[in-house]
Amino acid sequence: MFQFHLEVLLPYLLPLLLLILPTTIFFLTKPNNKVSSTSTNNNIITLPKSYPLIGSYLSFRKNLHRRIQWLSDIVQISPSATFQLDGTLGKRQIITGNPSTVQHILKNQFSNYQKGTTFTNTLSDFLGTGIFNTNGPNWKFQRQVASHEFNTKSIRNFVEHIVDTELTNRLIPILTSSTQTNNILDFQDILQRFTFDNICNIAFGYDPEYLTPSTNRSKFAEAYEDATEISSKRFRLPLPIIWKIKKYFNIGSEKRLKEAVTEVRSFAKKLVREKKRELEEKSSLETEDMLSRFLSSGHSDEDFVADIVISFILAGKDTTSAALTWFFWLLWKNPRVEEEIVNELSKKSELMVYDEVKEMVYTHAALSESMRLYPPVPMDSKEAVNDDVLPDGWVVKKGTIVTYHVYAMGRMKSLWGDDWAEFRPERWLEKDEVNGKWVFVGRDSYSYPVFQAGPRVCLGKEMAFMQMKRIVAGIVGKFKVVPEAHLAQEPGFISFLSSQMEGGFPVTIQKRDS
């Protein structure tokens, strides 16, 4: 009974206790509202009110259900696309959508903006010291070893063999069967299964066979989702001490997290042990995957390599499936774009090879446009190692969290024009004056930081695009993905460590007329 009451009361009890601290502490923080109110879409948007000690926690909690959109609204009305969000006990977070500031923290002052202790401590139970939760020599080592997986030869093998096999032998039969039964599929779940099989194949040389006609969910998949969600929700608490107390007493969400992480790490360690055994039994492997490279590099500690495995599952499974989920919803909402893609595919062979996939220029633009509006990672944060001043004049104190808001940047008129809300792949294209074909014209990575930028830019960007284009070709060339009627209204866009469509993506599959 004590544990139950503690679980329920903690998020409310601690902020209340803060309010009755001595008057001397009362003035440690003061309201800091630098942006005046304005009107956007007939809704009055203002910088959240800040109170002593609890900062803007009340506004944050009120908007927790739509925190990404709420923070995006504020970024867009802020004069320099940057504002300060006051946390509890004087903590400050600067949130920006300013490309100059993004370049400043991701490139120009890279060494001063790291994965700080706020980030690493919060995610250490789940991600350990994997590449997304570390800095310095450890990060450099993991990045260097992983980079060998993303050369042209590896990407070609990935597209022509791994992705194509998963399409031909698993996804296409499931979709074909669905056209006959007219049953409803959760397409978000289907895509997550597909990309999970793919990342395990290319990175670990292991096929989990998760994409099957059965809708039963594996114990690992459920544990992985729980670990991702609960770890992410730690960031939303007013004080870290709340989740730390729950962890100490092993209650509530922290008890579930411990159970989930145990299951996830058990899976990862099993992969590591099997790969070690394979390396011991064979003098050489037919194909050298990323896991083999890490184990052959002299770093054979099981816990450390398990951290790497978990991080790369996060990178390869969740982000790609998130991008494709929103892409197929947008395609249904914009039949003109779908017809353009069908037309592009009509000029390709059915069993597309690497070069044909690479030349899917319009589809590449459509995917880029989709991720502009619905980025797989809508926000990312760094922590200042030392005091600094941002290009737009904001003063950053040591230990301050600086967050760049990718979702907001994709909706800024200053970057995309008055038609920013329109799904228009042509904004990424130009006509070649000689042959009249489309040519893709990219944006600089600081205005479009969907794949991060600077030294931490995503290693798998090219592989991700190639995988997505091959999947789009395999599906759109044969089928129509038709969402349920209620999805005519924009579904909920939520995010844990990567974005999702709230409530799944229920669809029916129809055969495309030839």
UniProtKB/Swiss-Prot annotation:
Belongs to the cytochrome P450 family. Its cofactor is heme. This is Cytochrome P450 94A1. Its EC number is 1.14.-.-. Catalyzes the omega-hydroxylation of various fatty acids (FA) from 10 to 18 carbon atoms. The substrate specificity is higher for laurate > palmitate > myristate > linolenate > linoleate > oleate > caprate. May play a minor role in cutin synthesis and could be involved in plant defense. It is found in: Endoplasmic reticulum membrane. Gene3D superfamilies: Cytochrome P450. The chain crosses the membrane at residues 7-29. One of its GO terms (cellular component) is endoplasmic reticulum membrane. It comes from the Eukaryota. It is a single-pass membrane protein. Heme binds at residue 458. One of its GO terms (molecular function) is monooxygenase activity. It comes from Vicia sativa (Spring vetch). Induction: By clofibrate. Keywords: Endoplasmic reticulum, Heme, Iron, Membrane, Metal-binding, Monooxygenase, Oxidoreductase, Transmembrane, Transmembrane helix. The gene is CYP94A1.
